[in-house]
From Swiss-Prot:
GO terms for biological process: cerebral cortex development; cognition; corpus callosum development; oligodendrocyte development; positive regulation of translation; regulation of myelination; rRNA base methylation. The lineage of its organism: Eukaryota, Metazoa, Chordata, Craniata, Vertebrata. The keyword RNA-binding applies. This is 28S rRNA (cytosine-C(5))-methyltransferase. It catalyses: cytidine(3782) in 28S rRNA + S-adenosyl-L-methionine = 5-methylcytidine(3782) in 28S rRNA + S-adenosyl-L-homocysteine + H(+). It comes from the Eukaryota. One of its GO terms (molecular function) is rRNA (cytosine-C5-)-methyltransferase activity. The gene is NSUN5. The modification Phosphoserine is found at residue 167. GO terms for cellular component: nucleolus; nucleoplasm.
Length: 429
């Protein structure tokens, strides 16, 4: 199935409540899930605008075999996207017959609403906020390459490498074909906002991982040395797992758990492309994993990134309207699960270091979960100071919460995120 047909299928599924955008994208069997997800999200964001243009241009009356959802995707690509990919084939020819009329109707809509930019046609809640202006962060996959080789490749393509950034202001100022190394994150390259690398040969070969800046924190802060045994408790879609494997240099073992079979299948493809060979995937509930199982007796490190409200993820608003402000009932349920998962992780007998992370902004899912878990294990574990140079710290809701990290588009040029590093307290002998 081609990109445009796959995107139309996802839009139809969302409209008929068959699932969320992300879930339907992962179950679509389309190979490039990032590309498909981006196209669906942008088409959905402009849905009302596209409906108006298609109706006023009479496109569906003229092309009676053209399905509405496919028409919406194609018109988005023609008028608002990057143009037809791979030449566009018959769809480019079909839309070409109506191109002048569609462009005229879009221009007429702007005049009618008194705006000059496409973005200004959106409802306020759908307009790009700070997150849409974030730089493009690209993690170098050290299982397959190194930063120097990647930098040289981009330089040969006409990009200008500016070295390591000295501050976030350097990242904010990026334009054109300039790129930098992140000031705090090793192996993380930074390109201007809206840089599209989904079709780049290094990405397609698994040499690059497109990953949010804050999403790189959990594996980096867990920092398991090569040869370690690690549990990735809620692993899909797999970017953090591949990061762990890179830190391990594929030496050791990662036990990765997730309950969603389709997400695990996509994750297996992602890990194979990234060259990961030290990971054992299991379709299993982490809460049902026995800490006394001999397989896990050498697990010293656990990464726990459980299901959460996603209130720090701007894209979640497209899938779940209101996700930015989850209801008290939903928060209570999520926090209960998160606390059970964290307390369960702390029962693994050889555990030395754990990273707990969420893409939530809510205190109930973050500081409160960590505080309660530590209180249930008095004297056994403590919060470790994490990345002192990181500017955004945990909320001061209990002593030591400043050791936690928070992230946001405004303060750290990333999605909303929370990270806590928990270490076992060594008992004096």
């Amino acid at each position: 199935m081609g990109l445009y047909a796959a995107a139309a299928g996802v839009l139809a599924g969302v409209e008929s409540r068959q699932g969320s955008i992300k879930g339907l994208v992962y179950s679509s069997n389309f190979q490039n899930v990032k590309q498909l997800y981006a196209l669906v999200c942008e088409t959905q964001r402009y849905s009302a605008v596209l409906d108006a243009v298609i109706a006023s241009a009479g496109l569906l009356r003229a092309e009676k075999k053209l399905r509405p959802h496919l028409a919406k995707v194609l018109v988005y690509e023609l008028l608002l996207g990057k143009g037809f990919r791979g030449g566009g084939g018959r769809w480019k020819a079909l839309l070409g017959r109506h191109q002048a009329r569609l462009k005229a109707e879009l221009a007429r809509l702007k005049v009618h609403r008194g705006v000059s930019r496409n973005e200004d046609l959106l409802e306020v809640g759908s307009r790009p906020g700070p997150a849409s202006q974030l730089p493009r962060f690209v993690r170098v996959n050290t299982l397959k390459t190194c930063s120097d080789d990647v930098v040289d490749y981009f330089k040969r393509q006409g990009f200008s490498y500016q070295g390591r950034a000295s501050s976030l202001d350097d990242l904010r100022a990026l334009k054109g074909k300039h790129f930098l190394l992140d000031p705090l994150m090793p192996e993380l390259l930074v390109f201007p906002a809206q840089t599209d690398l989904h079709e780049h040969p290094l990405y397609r070969a698994g040499h690059l991982i497109l990953q949010d800046r804050a999403s790189c924190l959990p594996a980096m802060l867990l920092d398991p040395p090569p040869g370690s045994h690690v549990i990735d408790a809620c692993a899909a879609p797999g970017n953090k797992t591949s990061h762990l494997a890179a830190l391990l240099k594929n030496q050791g073992k990662i036990f990765a758990f997730d309950l969603d079979a389709k997400r695990l299948a996509s994750m297996a493809t992602l890990l194979a492309r990234a060259g990961v060979s030290c990971c054992e995937l299991a379709e299993e509930d982490f809460l049902a994993v026995s800490p006394s199982d001999p397989r896990y007796h050498e697990v010293h490190y656990i990464l726990l990134d459980p299901s959460c409200s996603g209130s720090g993820m701007p894209s979640r608003q497209l899938e779940e309207p209101g996700a930015g402000t989850p209801s008290p009932v939903r928060l209570h349920a999520l926090a209960g699960f998160q606390q059970r998962a964290l307390c369960h992780a702390l029962t693994f007998p050889s555990l030395q270091r754990l990273v707990y992370s969420t893409c939530s902004l809510c205190q109930e899912e973050n500081e409160d979960v960590v505080r309660d878990a530590l209180q249930q294990n008095p004297g056994a574990f403590r919060l470790a100071p994490a990345l002192p140079a990181w500017p955004h710290r945990g909320l001061s809701t209990f002593p030591g919460a400043e050791h936690c990290l928070r992230a946001s588009p405004e303060t750290t040029l990333s999605s909303g995120f929370f990270v806590a590093v928990i270490e076992r307290v060594e008992v004096p002998r």
